[in-house]
Amino acid sequence: MSTVPLNEIGQEFVRNKIGLVGIGILATLFIISAMAALTIPLETLKTWNNPESWLEFPKTALPAWINLFLSEKIPEHKILTNSEDSLQSTEELTIFSQQFSVVYEFDDFPNDFIYEFTAKYSGSPLLQISVIRPDGMTVELLSRSLPYLESAVHHERVFSTDNAVKKNLILQSEKFGFLLNDISAEQIVFSESSVQKVLNGKYVFLIRLVGTSSENEIVKSSLILGGKVFGFVGTDELRRDLSVGLLWGTPLALFIGIAVAIGSVVMGLLYGVYAGFIGKKTDETMMRFNDVIYALPALPFLIILAVTISNSIFVMVGFLMIFGWVGVAKVSRSMALQIKTRQYVEASKIMGQRSSKIILKHILPQLLPYAFASVAISVPAAITTEAGLSFLGLGDPSFPTWGQILHDASTHGAAARGLWWWVIPPGLMIAVTGLAFVFIGNALDTIVNPRLKR
C-alpha cells in the first residue's frame, strides 16, 4: 500500500470511469435523501406503523405505471376532496348537501369506496348517501341517524363493506338484472344494470345531512375510490405508500452506512497506528485484544445485543462500529510499522517530539488514502448488516428502513403471493447503494495500491 498525495488521488480518480459512476449513483442517492427530507413530513416516521394513518390508501396496490403496459386498464386509486356544497333551510328542516363527481374509465371494479367526514351538528341528524350512475339510475347507499350530540363535532368513516350499505342495495335488487347477494357493494354500484360488467362514465355521489338545527354542517370530507394501482411503487398489506418507505429509507441507509464506516475506520486507524508506533509489549497486548474481538462472531452477538439491550437504530450503529474496526486496525498497524522506520520519523524522535505529535503529523496523513478507500468499502457491509437484522425482525420498527420493509414483506408472504413491488424495490435500493460505494472504494483502492493497477 503506497502513500499517494491527495491531489494526485483526485486527478487519478476523475480519470477512473467506475469511480465516476459510483459518484454519480451516490449523488443521486443524496438528491433522493434531500427530496425525502423536504417533501415528506417527519410525522410520517411516527405514523409508519399506525394502520389508522393509512386507511385512505388501497391495500396491496400495484404501481400506477403498470397501466402503461396493459390493454385492460386497472382502476386507479382516487381520493376526492373537492365537493360542491349547498345548504337548504326551511322552518322545520336544514339540509346540508355535498356532491362528489368522478369519471370512471377502467376495465375492472374498484376495491371499495369510503366516505370520510367530520360533521358539526346538534341533535341526531339523518345522513343519506346515494349515487347517480352514468345510465341515470339513482342508487341509495345509506340512510341512518348519527349519534346524538349537543353542538359537537363527530368524525366517522362509511365503508362500502358496511352491512347497512349492502342491505340497502339488496332492497333495490329490482333495478338490476342479476343476483346481488354474492357480490360486493362496489361491484353492484359500478356494474351495468342488466349484466355484471363495469359501467364506465360519470358517477355523482350525493351526501345529505338532514336535521333541525341551522348550524348542522359537514366541516371536512373526502370520498375515496379504492383502486388497484397507486403511486410510483404501490402499497403494502397495511395500505402504506411504499414510495414513502423507499424515500425515507435512503437517508437512513446513508446515515447507517457512512456513520458506521467513518466511526469504525477512525477507531481502527487510531488503534492500529498507536500500537504499531509504540511497539513492544503495548503493541503485543493491543493486538491480542484485537484478535479476540476479531474472532467474535459478529452476527450472533448483534442478534443477542438487539434482543437483550435495545433494537434502536442508534444503538445498532454503535454495535456495528464496535465489530467493524478490527480489520482496519491490523492494516494500519502494519503500515505504521513501515512508516516509523523512515528517517524523518527517526529525526522527529531524536528532536524530542511527542509520540502523539509524530503520529498526527507524520504517520496519519500518509494513511488517509487508505482510510478513504476503507470508508467507501465498509459502507455496503454496514447497510446490508442492518438490513439483515431488520429482515430477521431485530431492527428498529419505528424507522422505515429497506430491511424493515423486506421484513414486513416476508411476514405477509409477499413473495409467495406475487407482490413483487413490495420485494424488488427495497432489495434493488440496497444493491444499488452498496454498488455505488463498492465502485468508489475499488477506484480509490486501485489508485493507492499500485499492485491493483492494470
Spans of features found by a protein language model:
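Gly/Trp-centered helix-boundary motif
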Residues: 1-257, 409-427, 431-432, 445-454
